[in-house]
Amino acid sequence: MLLRLILKSGLLAVIAFSESVTFRFDEAPINNIVYSSSFWLSSSAAIDPSRENRFIFQVGYCTIFNQQNNNYWSYPNVDMGLKITKNLSVTTKAYGFSIQEEAPQVLGAGIQYYFGTNNDTLDWSACIQRVDLKGLEHFRISSITFDIRKWISLRSTRLRIGVGSNFFKENSYLMGDNIPTKIEGQINFLGLDITMPLSIFILGIEARMNADRVLTTIFLQKEIF
């Protein structure tokens, strides 16, 4: 009951306080836009190694709280995953959307490797993911994310907890005295996911915490076969 309440409260908070993100350098601080965009790209599909289904489709609504500016920006998330073997999954992101005058495109892929004390107890996962953000007027981003997680069972709820790092390179199209031609950076984070069954779906909330930003995602996952 407590975890269900946390999920519901998180969803209400995201809807109540978030606002549409901007990808334009003339509307917000450049570093804020770039770092928040790359942090968003670091999200990955929560593929549970204990489940038997091979293909998953996951959609979510991500909100990033920028502590320096005290603002919330929201982004969509779409992930797909396919279990190749018991120990290995491949993931992909390939979607676009329209916001204001922009049409961002998210393209990427990754792998998740599962391991444990023996082949029957796969309660650890290691993930590497490359994701690019294209289609914008002012910049593009290429990012690589590494993370390692521990899966924990709590009754019907599953937890995924761990740490990770996001490395990115941004190239600017817009020229100006105060606009760098490129920005490179690294975002280290702590991660915690909570998932639980909801009818034929899996409902989850993801949190990624950094010293400057907090990312929260509400997602719905469907296992196809």
Label the predicted regions.
Residues 2, 122, 200-201, 213:
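Disordered, low-complexity tails and leader-like regions
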Residues 19-56, 60-63, 68-71, 136-202, ...:
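Outer-membrane beta-barrel transmembrane domain signature
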Residues 76-77, 82, 94-96, 101-102, ...:
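Outer-membrane beta-barrel domain signature
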Residues 14-18:
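Sec/Tat signal peptide C-region and signal peptidase I cleavage site
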Residues 2-12:
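Sec-dependent signal peptide recognition
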Residues 77-79, 108-110, 145-147, 189-193, ...:
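Membrane-embedded beta-strand positions in outer-membrane beta-barrel channels/transporters
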Residues 62-122, 129-130:
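Glycine- and aromatic-enriched membrane insertion/assembly motifs of diderm outer-membrane
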